[in-house]
């Protein structure tokens, strides 16, 4: 019986090339050998060698160790810890196993297959983290802002900064971990700042799990704005955030900048409810009309009516009045409104 055979083709495995480290060229192929499930660490290392984020963090921290007894440099410790977290290994004791991983060693610019150059163990990582002082953390937050600025070739005409306090649930006896009723757990409540159009991280500030005060918000953002203004004096800056940020201290800071504005959530109160009641009556009337027309088969069913309005408002603690935009919303289910039982409109927004 005749058979048909095809000549074997020459085959070269496709390779991935990475930036070299001293004394080594770095390539990845798929022919076996020493294995690792964390190629991402090597990719992160290659990216960092281009942008220099770990170098910024290293320069921000004061290392008080005696140089005669240092096995792992501060830069190596930060590289190992940060990349472990990025790859999903949050626990410090994960370092006990990953210190031998060739990809994590490669990320730290160490020979990946050597057996005499292990990375730091979990105990060393723990000592490093506990040695950090408040001033180190402050300078690391500054380093993030400088990294954000370095991502631009020239000063942008305008940027929008989104401010957000995000719950980070804690377990055990972590320092400054507090119970937060809103989130229903013990947590930290770090402040994260992102640039809205690109999603780029501007900075992150670790803080206790309690609700921030206006003075604290202003203190943090004063430092962020100062760094931005040193590099971008003419850039218009818009800050956005929820009701955590509608504090007189932060609002005044933004007004004093001269080329910045804000859009913040505003907690409802009796004064705002009275100012919005006229629009709420209109919303109820619109819904009643739609329901009547639907009952007569003269129109579609309407589940909600939403109307928007605005007015000038000044709380006693504010230095001036600001424009408040609010939503009056009435739902068809039980003809109830959202936002609370006191008749207040839903989530008014204040702007400067």
Residue ranges and their predicted role:
Residues 1-212, 216-231, 256:
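Dynamic "connector" segments at or just before major functional cores
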Residues 2-3, 12-26, 263-352:
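An anionic, glycine-rich sequence signature occurring as long contiguous blocks
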Residues 105, 214, 227, 253, ...:
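Flexible, acidic glycine-rich loops studded with aromatic residues
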Residues 160, 236-238, 261:
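Hydrophobic "anchor" residues on beta-strands that sit immediately upstream
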Residues 164, 235-246:
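Acidic/histidine-rich, metal-coordinating catalytic segments
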Residues 166-168, 207-209, 244-246, 267-271:
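Active-site beta-loop-alpha junctions enriched in small/polar residues
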Residues 172, 247-252, 273-277:
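A short acidic (Asp/Glu
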Residues 251-260:
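Short, surface-exposed basic-aromatic patches at helix termini and helix-loop junctions that form
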């Amino acid at each position: 019986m005749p058979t048909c055979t095809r000549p074997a083709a020459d085959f070269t495995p496709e390779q991935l090339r990475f930036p070299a480290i001293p004394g080594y060229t770095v390539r990845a192929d798929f022919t076996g050998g020493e294995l690792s499930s964390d190629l991402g660490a090597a990719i992160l290392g290659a990216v960092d060698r281009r942008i220099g984020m770990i170098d910024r963090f290293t320069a921000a921290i004061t290392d008080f160790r005696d140089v005669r007894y240092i096995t792992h440099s501060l830069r190596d410790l930060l590289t190992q810890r940060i990349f472990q977290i990025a790859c999903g290994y949050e626990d410090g004791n994960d370092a006990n196993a990953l210190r031998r991983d060739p990809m994590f060693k490669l990320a730290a610019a160490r020979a990946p297959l050597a057996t005499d150059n292990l990375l730091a163990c979990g105990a060393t990582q723990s000592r490093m983290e506990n040695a950090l002082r408040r001033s180190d953390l402050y300078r690391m937050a500054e380093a993030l802002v400088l990294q954000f600025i370095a991502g631009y070739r020239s000063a942008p005409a305008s940027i929008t900064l989104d401010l957000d306090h995000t719950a980070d649930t804690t377990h055990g006896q972590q320092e400054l971990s507090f119970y937060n009723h809103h989130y229903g757990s013990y947590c930290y409540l770090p402040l994260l700042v992102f640039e809205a159009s690109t999603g780029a991280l501007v900075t992150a500030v670790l803080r206790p799990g309690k609700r921030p005060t206006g003075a604290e918000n202003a203190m943090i953002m004063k430092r962020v704005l100062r760094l931005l203004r040193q590099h971008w004096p003419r850039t218009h800056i818009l800050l956005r955030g929820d009701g955590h940020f509608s504090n007189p201290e932060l609002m005044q800071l933004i007004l004093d900048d001269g080329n910045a504005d804000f859009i913040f959530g505003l907690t409802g109160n009796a004064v705002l409810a009275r100012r919005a009641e006229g629009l709420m009556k209109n919303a109820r009337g619109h819904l009643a009309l739609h329901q009547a027309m639907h009952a007569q088969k003269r129109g579609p069913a309407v589940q909600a009516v939403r109307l928007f309005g605005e007015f000038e408002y000044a709380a006693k603690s504010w230095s001036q009045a600001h424009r408040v935009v609010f939503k009056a919303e009435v739902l068809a289910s039980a003809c109830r409104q959202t936002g609370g039982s006191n008749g207040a409109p839903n989530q008014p927004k204040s702007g400067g």
